[in-house]
Amino acid sequence: MNDQIPMTILGVEKLRKELEMLKTIKRPKIIKSIIEARQHGDLKENSEYHAAREEQGFCEGRIKEIELKLSKARIIDITKVKNNGVIIFGSTVTILNLTSNQEFTYRIVGDDESNFKRKLISINSPMSRGLVGKKVSDVATIKTPVGDVKYKILKIEYN
């Protein structure tokens, strides 16, 4: 079983920066909050202490999650991947909705990098699954909650 997680170079850097921030800034701040809260006496009814401990749990959980993802990361540099003119992980694709006649441009990225507002869609999304492997001028049928939607591939970029 392949448990590697595909990521772009930018995606890996983003996770590394978050991990560093959690370890060097957030974790020490939480520890300081716990120490200060302990000084307020009885821990059973000390809401500051319990809140800090809960925050510590979330922080440590996120650190472990990021470390695991980075250990399984398969970094894909789109500029060095043979693409054969088809949509692949990391490519930027411009598509035309054949029903509404609207154009959209998306980049296909890893799960942690996806951000629909920034037009970054996960490789595991229905849209990506329907687009991967297609060439310019192909029509992709994407299953959506409101039914099938057809998109024509207008442009593929590998940058």
Curated annotation (Swiss-Prot):
PROSITE patterns: GREAB_1
GO MF, any single term: DNA binding
Single biological process term from Gene Ontology: DNA-templated transcription elongation
Keywords, sorted A to Z: DNA-binding, Transcription, Transcription regulation
Keyword Transcription regulation in record: yes
InterPro entries documented for this protein: GreA/GreB_C_sf, TF_GreA/GreB_CS, Tscrpt_elong_fac_GreA, Tscrpt_elong_fac_GreA/B, Tscrpt_elong_fac_GreA/B_C, Tscrpt_elong_fac_GreA/B_fam, Tscrpt_elong_fac_GreA/B_N, Tscrpt_elong_fac_GreA/B_N_sf
UniProt xrefs under HAMAP family: GreA_GreB
Function according to Swiss-Prot or TrEMBL: Necessary for efficient RNA polymerase transcription elongation past template-encoded arresting sites. The arresting sites in DNA have the property of trapping a certain fraction of elongating RNA polymerases that pass through, resulting in locked ternary complexes. Cleavage of the nascent transcript by cleavage factors such as GreA or GreB allows the resumption of elongation from the new 3'terminus. GreA releases sequences of 2 to 3 nucleotides.
Family, as annotated: Belongs to the GreA/GreB family.
Name listed for the protein in its UniProt record: Transcription elongation factor GreA
The organism of origin for this protein: Buchnera aphidicola subsp. Baizongia pistaciae (strain Bp)
Gene this protein is translated from: greA
